[in-house]
């Protein structure tokens, strides 16, 4: 009899445990609670790879008839629509879907388009990548590089050739042109470097101004509208190759370590079958002459991990006190 009572108690305990587990899992599912780290509450990161997971609810997966693709808004969108034309056609053939290149004028517009579901595949610039990942559900998987794995660009602080400025220390008391607050080389990296290496802080030691894009800053210094600017040298080199500016008329007073370039990726809820084909399009694309001429520092797309390749950029954000509030 005593043994029967013990068995009954044991069964009762098992039933209670099962009920508790079922109830708690139901609550988690219904409230959308999950591990997400620094990601916005709209996303989950159960595998802790620092990017948004594919939704467990398949009804939230997106399988568009037309894939919308955009490139980071660093220069004239019309120029880049032509440069990316061959790739767009290759992606269309690989995925079996219509692909449209969607030009954007600024980082904010690109981020909002991804967050709202209007973008499926995109290239976000170095500084915007962590913001796009945390606030817009962007999942980067590729970057331009050489066959041997080399990649990247540097931040440069430039002046006109005949400027009296020869060192960042001489920025004090002057106006420095940044590009936009989300840009790595156009704002975040130089801010951290100027503060850490030269004890120069915007508003306290110099006046900051924002041009909007790297080409605006470069042309601003070139034409004398800005005295000093921090820019991505990859953009500078492309403008020189296209004959937009003459290299001899500008001078570099500071050059940073190498940073990762634009990260290419997809919306977190894009159907996995489509994602696989999109990745295939990137990794199998044979670069045409226009592409090689424009992106001369690289010759292929390589696989990347946001957690690894963007570690230095997240550290720069931390040094600048940047938090991904996703407002």
Placement of each model-derived feature along the sequence:
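N-terminal hydrophobic or amphipathic helices and topogenic motifs
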Residues: 2-3, 7-8, 25-109, 292-327
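Bacterial N-terminal signal peptides
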Residues: 14-23
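Bilobed "Venus flytrap"/periplasmic-binding protein-like clamshell domains
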Residues: 69-92, 127, 150-219, 226-228, ...
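Periplasmic-binding protein-like
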Residues: 72-73, 147-156, 183-185, 244-316
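Short helix-initiation/N-cap motifs at beta->coil->alpha
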Residues: 101-112, 202-219, 258-260
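Acidic, polar ligand-binding/catalytic clefts
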Residues: 111-170
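Ligand-binding "clamshell"
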Residues: 132-144, 239-253
